[in-house]
Design a protein with these regions (language model features):
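Terminal accessory carbohydrate-recognition/targeting modules of carbohydrate-active enzymes
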Residues: 1-163
Length: 163
């Protein structure tokens, strides 16, 4: 079930689709995600193991897909920091490292994108790939005011701080 997200009092709005893609209402490009696991690339909208929930009473989505030895979890929520951002959190609950590909490069990240991304998937120009260790989390953020890339501030709220 797709839902609208944004910050109260802010003008930016977006839609989180039922597979965790983010479609900004300002006409900018959709942000989709893919997972390079041990055996293959996983595209959420094509995965029968896809599950999504919204935290009761809060605008935080959680989308899960099954990968070898666990789940890959994506959470989406908005914060007012830096003029408003949509934060996308990827938690690898499996026991193996993976890589996450996102279809936009104008995002803040908690770690540098991979210089030599994995092969086996055709990604749109401007996509980035981020390594995610086993049992670890990476976050990216899409600025609401204007496209930015760079380091995500360490004090950016987590999904637990939003709910």
């Amino acid at each position: 079930m797709s839902r609208v997200i944004g910050n109260r009092g802010g003008t930016w709005r977006g839609v989180v689709t039922d597979h965790g893609s983010i479609i900004p209402s300002d006409g900018s490009a959709e942000l989709s995600w893919h997972v390079a696991a041990d055996d293959r690339w996983y595209t959420p909208q094509n995965e029968p193991s896809l599950r999504q929930k919204w935290y009761a009473g809060f605008p935080v989505s959680e989308t899960r897909i099954r990968i070898p030895n666990g789940d890959m979890v994506q959470r989406v929520y908005c914060v007012a920091d830096l003029g408003g951002m949509t934060v996308i959190e990827f938690e690898n609950e499996s026991t193996l490292p993976v890589a996450i590909a996102v279809t936009r490069s104008d995002v803040f990240t908690t770690r540098a994108p991979a210089e030599n991304p994995p092969q086996g998937i055709d990604l749109p120009a401007g996509s980035i790939v981020l390594p995610v260790g086993h049992k670890s989390t990476v976050r990216i953020a899409l600025a609401h005011s204007s496209p930015h890339a760079g380091r995500l501030p360490e004090d950016t709220p987590t999904h637990q701080q939003v709910v």
